[in-house]
Protein backbone atom coordinates (compact mmCIF):
# COMPACT_ATOMS: atom_id res chain seq x y z
CA UNK A 1 0.00 0.00 0.00
CA UNK A 2 1.32 3.42 -0.95
CA UNK A 3 1.93 5.55 2.12
CA UNK A 4 0.27 8.94 2.46
CA UNK A 5 2.01 12.23 3.14
CA UNK A 6 1.67 13.62 6.66
CA UNK A 7 1.83 17.29 7.61
CA UNK A 8 1.62 19.33 10.81
CA UNK A 9 -1.39 21.65 10.88
CA UNK A 10 -1.63 22.66 14.54
CA UNK A 11 0.72 23.47 17.42
CA UNK A 12 0.23 24.01 21.14
CA UNK A 13 2.56 24.42 24.09
CA UNK A 14 2.70 25.39 27.74
CA UNK A 15 6.27 25.63 29.00
CA UNK A 16 8.48 27.32 31.60
CA UNK A 17 9.34 30.05 29.08
CA UNK A 18 5.93 30.64 27.50
CA UNK A 19 2.35 29.48 28.05
CA UNK A 20 1.37 29.38 24.36
CA UNK A 21 3.38 28.15 21.41
CA UNK A 22 4.06 31.68 20.05
CA UNK A 23 5.26 32.76 23.52
CA UNK A 24 7.38 29.62 23.75
CA UNK A 25 8.97 30.29 20.36
CA UNK A 26 9.65 33.94 21.25
CA UNK A 27 11.30 32.75 24.46
CA UNK A 28 13.47 30.25 22.60
CA UNK A 29 14.67 32.76 20.04
CA UNK A 30 15.54 35.26 22.75
CA UNK A 31 17.32 32.76 24.98
CA UNK A 32 14.83 33.09 27.82
CA UNK A 33 15.82 31.14 30.91
CA UNK A 34 13.09 29.18 32.67
CA UNK A 35 15.01 28.20 35.81
CA UNK A 36 14.32 29.44 39.32
CA UNK A 37 13.78 28.41 42.92
CA UNK A 38 11.18 25.69 43.40
CA UNK A 39 7.81 27.05 44.57
CA UNK A 40 5.77 23.83 44.28
CA UNK A 41 7.02 22.55 47.67
CA UNK A 42 9.64 23.26 50.34
CA UNK A 43 12.84 21.84 48.85
CA UNK A 44 15.10 22.78 51.79
CA UNK A 45 15.92 19.17 52.66
CA UNK A 46 16.54 18.14 49.05
CA UNK A 47 19.82 18.24 47.16
CA UNK A 48 18.29 20.37 44.39
CA UNK A 49 16.35 23.54 45.21
CA UNK A 50 15.52 24.78 41.70
CA UNK A 51 13.64 23.75 38.58
CA UNK A 52 11.99 25.18 35.47
CA UNK A 53 8.38 25.68 36.53
CA UNK A 54 5.51 26.99 34.41
CA UNK A 55 5.33 30.54 35.75
CA UNK A 56 2.21 31.85 37.53
CA UNK A 57 0.23 28.73 36.70
CA UNK A 58 -3.31 28.70 38.09
CA UNK A 59 -5.42 25.72 36.96
CA UNK A 60 -8.62 27.71 37.44
CA UNK A 61 -7.54 30.01 34.62
CA UNK A 62 -8.09 27.02 32.32
CA UNK A 63 -10.51 24.61 34.01
CA UNK A 64 -13.73 24.56 36.00
CA UNK A 65 -13.16 23.72 39.66
CA UNK A 66 -14.71 20.27 39.28
CA UNK A 67 -12.16 19.40 36.60
CA UNK A 68 -9.22 20.81 38.55
CA UNK A 69 -9.99 18.09 41.11
CA UNK A 70 -10.07 15.40 38.42
CA UNK A 71 -6.84 16.08 36.51
CA UNK A 72 -3.25 15.94 37.72
CA UNK A 73 -1.02 18.75 36.48
CA UNK A 74 0.50 16.57 33.75
CA UNK A 75 -2.96 15.98 32.26
CA UNK A 76 -3.89 19.64 32.73
CA UNK A 77 -0.80 20.72 30.83
CA UNK A 78 -1.47 18.13 28.12
CA UNK A 79 -5.05 19.28 27.65
CA UNK A 80 -4.04 22.96 27.57
CA UNK A 81 -1.47 22.26 24.84
CA UNK A 82 -3.91 20.08 22.90
CA UNK A 83 -6.64 22.74 23.12
CA UNK A 84 -4.28 25.24 21.53
CA UNK A 85 -3.11 22.82 18.83
CA UNK A 86 -6.66 21.76 17.91
CA UNK A 87 -7.85 25.37 17.74
CA UNK A 88 -4.77 26.29 15.71
CA UNK A 89 -5.39 23.48 13.23
CA UNK A 90 -9.09 24.15 12.83
CA UNK A 91 -10.07 20.46 12.77
CA UNK A 92 -13.67 19.90 13.81
CA UNK A 93 -16.74 17.80 13.11
CA UNK A 94 -17.47 20.13 10.18
CA UNK A 95 -14.32 19.16 8.27
CA UNK A 96 -13.26 15.80 9.76
CA UNK A 97 -14.85 12.45 10.40
CA UNK A 98 -14.25 12.27 14.15
CA UNK A 99 -14.13 8.47 13.96
CA UNK A 100 -10.87 8.93 12.05
CA UNK A 101 -9.23 11.40 14.42
CA UNK A 102 -6.89 9.76 16.92
CA UNK A 103 -5.11 10.94 20.05
CA UNK A 104 -1.54 9.90 20.92
CA UNK A 105 -0.78 12.04 23.97
CA UNK A 106 1.46 10.73 26.71
CA UNK A 107 3.64 11.37 29.74
CA UNK A 108 6.82 9.84 31.07
CA UNK A 109 5.75 9.09 34.63
CA UNK A 110 2.22 10.45 34.95
CA UNK A 111 0.75 11.79 38.18
CA UNK A 112 3.64 11.18 40.57
CA UNK A 113 2.90 14.26 42.66
CA UNK A 114 -0.68 13.23 43.34
CA UNK A 115 0.49 9.72 44.20
CA UNK A 116 2.91 11.20 46.73
CA UNK A 117 0.31 13.35 48.45
CA UNK A 118 -2.31 10.59 48.68
CA UNK A 119 0.27 8.11 49.96
CA UNK A 120 1.55 10.55 52.59
CA UNK A 121 -1.98 11.21 53.82
CA UNK A 122 -2.50 7.47 54.18
CA UNK A 123 0.87 6.92 55.87
CA UNK A 124 0.23 9.67 58.42
CA UNK A 125 -3.22 8.37 59.30
CA UNK A 126 -4.36 5.46 61.46
CA UNK A 127 -3.95 2.89 58.70
CA UNK A 128 -7.53 3.04 57.51
CA UNK A 129 -7.47 3.10 53.68
CA UNK A 130 -8.85 6.48 52.72
CA UNK A 131 -8.05 7.37 49.13
CA UNK A 132 -9.70 9.87 46.86
CA UNK A 133 -11.91 8.69 43.98
CA UNK A 134 -9.53 10.26 41.45
CA UNK A 135 -6.31 8.65 42.73
CA UNK A 136 -5.99 6.17 39.88
CA UNK A 137 -7.23 8.43 37.10
CA UNK A 138 -4.87 11.22 38.20
CA UNK A 139 -1.92 8.81 38.14
CA UNK A 140 -2.28 6.94 34.87
CA UNK A 141 -0.41 8.20 31.83
CA UNK A 142 -3.14 7.55 29.26
CA UNK A 143 -5.51 9.97 30.97
CA UNK A 144 -4.32 12.87 28.78
CA UNK A 145 -5.65 11.13 25.68
CA UNK A 146 -8.80 10.14 27.48
CA UNK A 147 -9.79 13.65 28.53
CA UNK A 148 -9.00 15.05 25.07
CA UNK A 149 -11.19 12.50 23.31
CA UNK A 150 -14.01 13.06 25.80
CA UNK A 151 -13.89 16.82 25.26
CA UNK A 152 -13.72 16.73 21.46
CA UNK A 153 -15.44 13.46 20.53
CA UNK A 154 -12.40 12.02 18.74
CA UNK A 155 -13.08 8.29 18.36
CA UNK A 156 -9.98 7.17 16.48
CA UNK A 157 -7.06 5.20 18.00
CA UNK A 158 -6.25 6.53 21.44
CA UNK A 159 -3.39 5.29 23.60
CA UNK A 160 -0.14 6.40 25.23
CA UNK A 161 3.38 5.35 24.34
CA UNK A 162 5.56 5.36 27.45
CA UNK A 163 9.34 5.40 27.09
CA UNK A 164 10.42 7.87 29.79
CA UNK A 165 12.04 10.92 28.19
CA UNK A 166 11.37 9.62 24.66
CA UNK A 167 7.62 9.18 25.23
CA UNK A 168 6.21 12.07 23.23
CA UNK A 169 8.61 11.61 20.32
CA UNK A 170 7.42 8.01 20.12
CA UNK A 171 3.84 9.35 20.21
CA UNK A 172 4.56 11.57 17.20
CA UNK A 173 6.01 8.61 15.32
CA UNK A 174 2.94 6.52 16.20
CA UNK A 175 0.68 9.30 14.94
CA UNK A 176 2.74 9.58 11.75
CA UNK A 177 2.35 5.85 11.13
CA UNK A 178 -1.40 5.88 11.81
CA UNK A 179 -1.93 8.56 9.16
CA UNK A 180 0.50 7.48 6.47
CA UNK A 181 -0.83 3.93 6.54
CA UNK A 182 -4.44 5.07 6.27
CA UNK A 183 -5.71 4.36 9.79
CA UNK A 184 -6.50 8.02 10.61
CA UNK A 185 -6.96 11.31 8.80
CA UNK A 186 -5.61 13.30 11.76
CA UNK A 187 -4.01 12.62 15.13
CA UNK A 188 -3.41 14.86 18.13
CA UNK A 189 0.07 13.87 19.33
CA UNK A 190 2.52 14.95 22.01
CA UNK A 191 2.85 14.77 25.75
CA UNK A 192 3.32 16.47 29.07
CA UNK A 193 5.24 16.24 32.31
CA UNK A 194 4.68 17.57 35.82
CA UNK A 195 7.15 15.92 38.18
CA UNK A 196 8.40 18.95 40.11
CA UNK A 197 7.53 17.61 43.53
CA UNK A 198 8.90 15.57 46.38
CA UNK A 199 8.91 12.28 44.48
CA UNK A 200 10.24 13.70 41.22
CA UNK A 201 13.02 15.81 42.69
CA UNK A 202 13.88 13.32 45.43
CA UNK A 203 13.89 10.34 43.10
CA UNK A 204 16.04 11.94 40.42
CA UNK A 205 18.37 13.32 43.12
CA UNK A 206 18.82 9.78 44.41
CA UNK A 207 19.87 8.74 40.90
CA UNK A 208 22.34 11.65 40.77
CA UNK A 209 20.66 12.78 37.55
CA UNK A 210 19.78 16.36 38.55
CA UNK A 211 22.03 19.38 38.69
CA UNK A 212 22.77 20.53 42.23
CA UNK A 213 24.07 23.97 41.24
CA UNK A 214 21.98 25.65 43.94
CA UNK A 215 24.27 28.69 44.09
CA UNK A 216 23.58 29.52 40.44
CA UNK A 217 20.39 27.84 39.19
CA UNK A 218 20.03 30.10 36.15
CA UNK A 219 23.13 28.57 34.59
CA UNK A 220 22.58 25.01 35.79
CA UNK A 221 21.18 23.66 32.53
CA UNK A 222 24.26 23.89 30.32
CA UNK A 223 24.22 21.18 27.64
CA UNK A 224 27.61 20.35 26.11
CA UNK A 225 29.46 22.62 28.55
CA UNK A 226 32.56 21.30 30.29
CA UNK A 227 31.07 21.79 33.76
CA UNK A 228 27.58 20.38 33.20
CA UNK A 229 26.47 18.41 36.24
CA UNK A 230 23.00 17.05 35.48
CA UNK A 231 19.65 18.08 34.08
CA UNK A 232 17.20 20.65 35.42
CA UNK A 233 13.65 19.43 35.91
CA UNK A 234 11.05 21.19 33.78
CA UNK A 235 7.30 20.88 33.37
CA UNK A 236 4.65 21.59 30.76
CA UNK A 237 3.42 20.02 27.55
CA UNK A 238 3.51 20.17 23.79
CA UNK A 239 0.93 19.05 21.25
CA UNK A 240 0.92 18.74 17.47
CA UNK A 241 -1.95 18.01 15.11
CA UNK A 242 -0.71 15.70 12.38
CA UNK A 243 -2.93 15.38 9.32
CA UNK A 244 -3.06 13.58 6.02
CA UNK A 245 -1.72 15.99 3.40
CA UNK A 246 -4.56 15.78 0.86
CA UNK A 247 -7.15 16.22 3.60
CA UNK A 248 -5.33 19.28 4.93
CA UNK A 249 -5.08 20.83 1.46
CA UNK A 250 -8.74 20.12 0.71
CA UNK A 251 -9.92 22.02 3.78
CA UNK A 252 -7.46 24.87 3.27
CA UNK A 253 -5.43 24.24 6.40
CA UNK A 254 -2.20 26.08 7.07
CA UNK A 255 0.77 23.72 7.09
CA UNK A 256 3.81 24.17 9.33
CA UNK A 257 5.97 21.29 8.14
CA UNK A 258 5.89 17.76 6.77
CA UNK A 259 6.74 14.69 8.85
CA UNK A 260 8.95 12.48 6.70
CA UNK A 261 10.53 9.84 8.93
CA UNK A 262 10.75 8.27 12.34
CA UNK A 263 13.10 5.78 13.94
CA UNK A 264 13.47 4.08 17.29
CA UNK A 265 15.88 1.72 19.01
CA UNK A 266 17.11 0.33 22.30
CA UNK A 267 20.58 0.68 23.79
CA UNK A 268 20.32 -2.76 25.42
CA UNK A 269 22.98 -1.49 27.81
CA UNK A 270 21.89 0.02 31.17
CA UNK A 271 18.73 1.18 32.93
CA UNK A 272 19.86 4.81 33.19
CA UNK A 273 23.28 5.35 31.60
CA UNK A 274 23.49 5.78 27.81
CA UNK A 275 25.64 3.49 25.75
CA UNK A 276 29.09 5.14 26.01
CA UNK A 277 29.40 5.41 22.22
CA UNK A 278 25.75 6.31 21.64
CA UNK A 279 25.01 3.02 19.85
CA UNK A 280 21.25 3.23 20.38
CA UNK A 281 21.13 6.84 19.22
CA UNK A 282 23.04 5.84 16.09
CA UNK A 283 20.43 3.21 15.24
CA UNK A 284 17.53 5.54 15.98
CA UNK A 285 18.86 8.28 13.69
CA UNK A 286 19.84 5.84 10.94
CA UNK A 287 16.39 4.25 11.03
CA UNK A 288 14.71 7.65 10.82
CA UNK A 289 16.85 8.54 7.79
CA UNK A 290 16.05 5.21 6.14
CA UNK A 291 12.36 5.65 6.87
CA UNK A 292 12.44 9.09 5.25
CA UNK A 293 14.44 7.85 2.26
CA UNK A 294 17.13 10.44 2.98
CA UNK A 295 20.90 10.35 2.92
CA UNK A 296 22.71 11.80 5.95
CA UNK A 297 23.75 14.79 3.84
CA UNK A 298 20.11 15.94 3.62
CA UNK A 299 19.91 16.92 7.29
CA UNK A 300 20.59 20.58 8.04
CA UNK A 301 19.71 20.80 11.72
CA UNK A 302 19.46 18.63 14.84
CA UNK A 303 17.52 19.50 17.96
CA UNK A 304 19.55 17.35 20.33
CA UNK A 305 18.26 15.47 23.35
CA UNK A 306 21.04 17.40 25.12
CA UNK A 307 20.03 17.08 28.77
CA UNK A 308 23.18 18.59 30.34
CA UNK A 309 24.35 15.29 31.83
CA UNK A 310 28.05 14.44 31.59
CA UNK A 311 27.59 11.08 29.87
CA UNK A 312 24.47 11.76 27.83
CA UNK A 313 25.66 14.84 25.94
CA UNK A 314 28.96 13.23 25.02
CA UNK A 315 27.30 10.00 23.85
CA UNK A 316 24.86 11.95 21.66
CA UNK A 317 27.66 13.93 20.02
CA UNK A 318 29.52 10.70 19.30
CA UNK A 319 26.36 9.20 17.81
CA UNK A 320 25.83 12.24 15.57
CA UNK A 321 29.37 11.98 14.25
CA UNK A 322 29.03 8.28 13.58
CA UNK A 323 25.79 8.73 11.62
CA UNK A 324 26.74 11.86 9.68
CA UNK A 325 30.51 11.56 9.32
CA UNK A 326 32.14 14.69 7.93
CA UNK A 327 28.70 16.14 7.18
CA UNK A 328 28.14 16.42 10.95
CA UNK A 329 30.20 19.63 10.82
CA UNK A 330 27.65 21.18 8.43
CA UNK A 331 24.67 20.53 10.73
CA UNK A 332 23.53 23.15 13.23
CA UNK A 333 22.92 21.53 16.63
CA UNK A 334 21.10 22.95 19.63
CA UNK A 335 19.53 21.91 22.92
CA UNK A 336 16.45 23.85 23.96
CA UNK A 337 16.59 22.13 27.38
CA UNK A 338 19.13 24.81 28.26
CA UNK A 339 16.11 27.13 28.49
CA UNK A 340 13.12 24.95 29.36
CA UNK A 341 14.78 22.32 31.50
CA UNK A 342 13.79 18.71 30.92
CA UNK A 343 10.04 18.13 30.56
CA UNK A 344 10.58 14.35 30.74
CA UNK A 345 7.74 12.76 28.73
CA UNK A 346 6.78 16.17 27.33
CA UNK A 347 10.28 17.03 26.13
CA UNK A 348 10.05 15.41 22.70
CA UNK A 349 6.84 17.26 21.85
CA UNK A 350 8.02 20.76 22.75
CA UNK A 351 11.33 20.06 21.01
CA UNK A 352 9.53 18.85 17.88
CA UNK A 353 7.69 22.18 17.91
CA UNK A 354 11.01 24.01 18.24
CA UNK A 355 12.38 22.06 15.27
CA UNK A 356 9.32 22.77 13.15
CA UNK A 357 9.39 26.50 13.90
CA UNK A 358 13.13 26.62 13.19
CA UNK A 359 12.39 25.16 9.75
CA UNK A 360 9.49 27.54 9.15
CA UNK A 361 11.20 30.72 10.36
CA UNK A 362 14.82 30.07 9.43
CA UNK A 363 16.04 30.71 12.97
CA UNK A 364 18.00 28.29 15.18
CA UNK A 365 17.34 28.87 18.90
CA UNK A 366 20.49 28.91 21.01
CA UNK A 367 21.92 26.53 23.56
CA UNK A 368 22.34 29.01 26.39
CA UNK A 369 24.67 28.80 29.40
CA UNK A 370 27.76 27.80 27.47
CA UNK A 371 30.95 28.93 29.19
CA UNK A 372 33.70 26.36 28.64
CA UNK A 373 34.28 23.88 25.82
CA UNK A 374 34.40 20.21 26.74
CA UNK A 375 37.60 18.83 25.17
CA UNK A 376 35.88 15.45 24.73
CA UNK A 377 33.31 17.03 22.38
CA UNK A 378 34.62 17.75 18.89
CA UNK A 379 34.97 21.53 18.62
CA UNK A 380 34.18 21.37 14.90
CA UNK A 381 30.58 20.39 15.65
CA UNK A 382 28.40 23.42 14.94
CA UNK A 383 26.59 23.74 18.26
CA UNK A 384 24.67 27.02 18.32
CA UNK A 385 25.76 28.54 21.63
CA UNK A 386 24.25 31.46 23.57
CA UNK A 387 22.69 33.40 20.69
CA UNK A 388 20.07 32.47 18.06
CA UNK A 389 21.23 32.21 14.49
CA UNK A 390 19.44 32.85 11.21
CA UNK A 391 19.79 29.89 8.88
CA UNK A 392 17.71 28.53 6.02
CA UNK A 393 17.17 24.84 6.76
CA UNK A 394 15.12 22.23 4.90
CA UNK A 395 15.32 19.06 7.01
CA UNK A 396 15.39 19.05 10.80
CA UNK A 397 15.88 16.05 13.07
CA UNK A 398 14.84 15.83 16.72
CA UNK A 399 16.25 13.26 19.15
CA UNK A 400 14.78 11.93 22.39
CA UNK A 401 16.52 9.30 24.50
CA UNK A 402 14.88 7.76 27.57
CA UNK A 403 15.89 5.81 30.65
CA UNK A 404 15.89 2.13 29.87
CA UNK A 405 17.87 2.93 26.74
CA UNK A 406 14.74 3.69 24.69
CA UNK A 407 15.45 6.08 21.82
CA UNK A 408 13.33 7.94 19.28
CA UNK A 409 14.13 10.23 16.35
CA UNK A 410 11.72 12.14 14.13
CA UNK A 411 12.54 14.08 10.95
CA UNK A 412 10.60 17.09 9.67
CA UNK A 413 10.79 18.78 6.28
CA UNK A 414 10.23 22.46 5.61
CA UNK A 415 6.92 22.91 3.82
CA UNK A 416 7.32 24.97 0.66
Please give the residue ranges for each predicted region.
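Phosphate/pyrophosphate-binding loops at sites that engage ATP/ADP/AMP, CoA/4′-phosphopantetheine
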Residues: 85-97, 248-252, 285-301, 323-327
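Acyl-CoA/ACP chain-elongation machinery
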Residues: 39, 183-229, 262-276, 306-313, ...
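Active-site-proximal alpha-helical scaffold in enzymes
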Residues: 78-91, 144-145, 149-152, 157-193, ...
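Conserved beta-ketoacyl condensing-enzyme motif
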Residues: 8, 24-25, 29-163, 178, ...
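Glycine-/small-residue-rich "gating" segment that lines the acyl/pantetheine channel
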Residues: 125-132, 173, 177, 181, ...
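Condensing-enzyme catalytic core mediating Claisen C-C bond formation in acyl metabolism
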Residues: 5-9, 36, 215-292, 300-301
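Flexible, low-complexity linker/loop segments at domain and module junctions
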Residues: 1-8, 95-98, 292-298, 329, ...
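ACP-dependent fatty acid/polyketide chain-elongation machinery
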Residues: 1-67, 89, 246-256, 353-367, ...
